[in-house]
């Protein structure tokens, strides 16, 4: 019998993944499309992913699907082809290849939610057919030469800290819901300029551009495929990569290196550093930037208090 969930402890699954010696490809995709029976769709997709030994995190809702997954490299093309041809809602999805293929996931988690991306707004404003105009890497570089363009980073502030475009502005909050709440007022002085939004892979900018268009902004654009596709395409096309630092990702890798520039500081000693870690104290698990010196000094913890808590 196939269980449509993980019945093994996380540590066991992680150890199994570490020692399986399977080369993997990390990809992401999303699609805003109406899914009539999300639970039924979820169970069918889970069976297929299980068959292909795919790990990752997938959210499904009536409004669509959002997936970050790790596929065995030797069956990557076969798996993507079968997945996209077996389900009508996945036809023509844009698959975003990660910028590096270090181990990203060791377990498959697939959940049905109210929304694939929570916006916490009181009105149903989102129309996937009325979003910002998509820009290629070349388009982005050209538009950034124009002083009328305003580049807006729609990621959380902790993501922005370790990597961003030089000219980008960012609402200093830690959730997308907060960003949407503040963004219209934040951009009110730029309403007559060209607004270019970007995020990690594009999903947040679909809603963000739709929201500001709903609120009267006219010249609204978004980077197609987000940072990931921009960097990959710019490298392939030998364009200047204008994103600097690291691209924060929500998996075991924590980040992808785009350039050698270090834009942030250690949260404990304030020396240059862009390495995110979680506090070793499981009751804290705080996400913070920590250099090697402080990692040793504080024993992988975010504070002396957390380290002393572990000793009790």
Curated annotation (Swiss-Prot):
Keyword annotations of the record: Oxidoreductase, tRNA processing
Top-tier EC class: oxidoreductase
Domain of life, source organism: Bacteria
Entry-linked Pfam families: Rhodanese, Rhodanese_C, UPF0176_N
Domain Rhodanese: 145-235
Active-site residues, record numbering mapped to chain: 199
HAMAP family noted in UniProt: TrhO
NCBIfam families (UniProt xref): PRK00142.1-1
Similarity section: Belongs to the TrhO family.
Protein name listed in UniProt: tRNA uridine(34) hydroxylase
Organism: Buchnera aphidicola subsp. Baizongia pistaciae (strain Bp)
Gene from which this protein is expressed: trhO
């Amino acid at each position: 019998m196939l269980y449509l969930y993980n019945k093994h402890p996380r540590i066991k699954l992680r150890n199994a993944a570490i020692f399986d010696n399977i080369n993997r490809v990390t990809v992401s995709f999303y699609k805003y499309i109406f899914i009539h029976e999300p639970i039924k769709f979820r169970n069918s997709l889970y069976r297929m992913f299980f068959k292909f030994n795919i790990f990752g995190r997938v959210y499904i809702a009536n409004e669509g699907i959002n997936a970050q997954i790790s596929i065995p490299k030797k069956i990557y093309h076969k798996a993507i082809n079968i997945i996209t041809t077996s389900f009508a809602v996945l036809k023509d999805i844009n698959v975003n290849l990660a910028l590096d293929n270090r181990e990203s996931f060791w377990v498959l988690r697939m959940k049905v939610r109210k929304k694939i991306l929570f916006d916490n707004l009181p009105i149903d404003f989102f129309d996937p057919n009325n979003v910002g105009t998509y820009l290629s890497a070349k388009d982005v570089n050209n538009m950034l030469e124009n002083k009328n363009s305003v580049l807006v980073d729609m990621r959380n502030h902790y993501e922005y800290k370790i990597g961003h475009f030089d000219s980008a502005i960012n609402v200093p909050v830690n959730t997308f819901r907060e960003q949407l709440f503040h963004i219209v007022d934040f951009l009110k002085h730029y309403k007559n300029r060209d607004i270019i939004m970007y995020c990690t892979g594009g999903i947040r900018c679909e809603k963000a551009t739709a929201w500001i268009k709903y609120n009267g902004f006219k010249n609204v654009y978004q980077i197609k495929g987000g940072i990931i596709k921009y960097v990959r395409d710019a490298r392939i096309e030998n364009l200047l990569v204008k994103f600097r630092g690291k691209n924060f990702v929500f998996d075991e890798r924590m980040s992808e290196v785009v350039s050698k520039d270090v834009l942030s500081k250690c949260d404990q000693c304030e020396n240059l550093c862009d390495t995110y870690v979680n506090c070793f104290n499981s009751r804290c698990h705080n996400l913070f930037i920590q250099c090697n010196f402080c990692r040793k000094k504080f024993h992988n913890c975010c504070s002396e208090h957390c380290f002393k808590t572990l000793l009790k």
